[in-house]
């Protein structure tokens, strides 16, 4: 099974994390199953950007984002070329290195 490496994040996993993912599951589902509480305000329906992550390694192994995900990502805080919504990004057969951005759009709008 592929592994996901979550880079250290002060709030979500200060030490970082490494866990196995099931091919075909989303990055978000794998993270939640392993105790990493990535925010997902829209309950995984691709209607917000709170689960935005940056795939630092392994992006090429995944299916590309669709038009709806791209439209939502345009609203994300800290958008980068390798950004994905973790609720839509399906794990393939290669390991991934994932960074959770410092803020979500909710935190920015609330002044954190």
UniProtKB/Swiss-Prot annotation:
PROSITE patterns assigned to the protein according to its UniProt record, in alphabetical order: 2FE2S_FER_2, ADX
Record flagged with keyword Transferase: no
Free-text comment on the cofactor: Binds 1 [2Fe-2S] cluster.
CDD domains associated with the record: fer2
GO annotation, cellular component aspect: cytosol
Domain of life: Bacteria
Domain 2Fe-2S ferredoxin-type: 1-104
One protein family per Pfam: Fer2
Assigned keywords, A-Z: 2Fe-2S, Electron transport, Iron, Iron-sulfur, Metal-binding, Transport
Swiss-Prot/TrEMBL cofactor(s): [2Fe-2S] cluster
Biological process per Gene Ontology, one example term: P450-containing electron transport chain
One Gene Ontology term of the molecular function aspect: electron transfer activity
InterPro entries, per the entry: 2Fe-2S_ferredoxin-like_sf, 2Fe-2S_ferredoxin-type, Adrenodoxin-like, Adrenodoxin_Fe-S_BS, Beta-grasp_dom_sf, Fdx_isc
Residues given in the record as [2Fe-2S] cluster binding sites: 42, 48, 51, 87
Role played: Ferredoxin are iron-sulfur proteins that transfer electrons in a wide variety of metabolic reactions.
Family: Belongs to the adrenodoxin/putidaredoxin family.
Protein name, UniProt field: 2Fe-2S ferredoxin
Phylogenetic classification of the source organism: Bacteria, Pseudomonadati, Pseudomonadota, Gammaproteobacteria, Pseudomonadales
